[in-house]
Amino acid sequence: RADYKVIPLINIGDTGEIKYKYAPKYIETFPHSIGWMLLRDYNCDGKKDVFYSASGGVMSVSKNISSIKLAFDLIDNKVSSDQYPGGDIGIYIPSADIPAIGYVDHDGDIDIITFGVLGTSLEYHRNYGMENHGTCDSLDYTLKNYCWGHFSEVGINTNKLVLKDTCNYNVPIPEGTTGGSGSSRHVGSTVTMFDNNGDSVMDLLLGDVTFDNVVMGLNGGTAPNTNSAMVSV
């Protein structure tokens, strides 16, 4: 990441075996000069598309158009979200951060969870592709919570989390409860969401460039977009 280069690794292992081989021939296929990159199938065609950081902290998406050869086509160089009260604004993600991109509400379109620009809490950008267009191939985002997970990071000297925190500022009727303070933090945080126990609400793994451990947050909610407060770490 320090050199903003893509390092392709192909799994050449047998079934059940993980064995990677460096494959430099694919380097030119991927976007250049990026801070982070995640492969996600946003349009449900079975091919992994590319979500990545572009210049200025905005997020871009390139669609996988491969047939015989691996190929991508830029479809959105500035993914935006309807953000209260500012309207449609590009989703800002520092190049040193890595957001979580996946299915928060399990409706088939890709959602985004990422740390806010200045805060220690997580923003939840919900994709309304299925609701508004009836298909998963739309990137139709709305900021539904400035403080998803009902927690905040303590500050720059520790990666501990404060649970049941109170959000100083949020969208009207936020989804997934409220939480998180507005204090500043350093960049270099990674967010991974996954369902640890199969209850359909997302738990979290949080990493930080300053610390050598990963913090796990367990979601005590029972339904996506209704109650998603972290109850233990």
PLM-predicted stretches and their roles:
Residues 1-233:
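Beta-propeller-forming repeat regions
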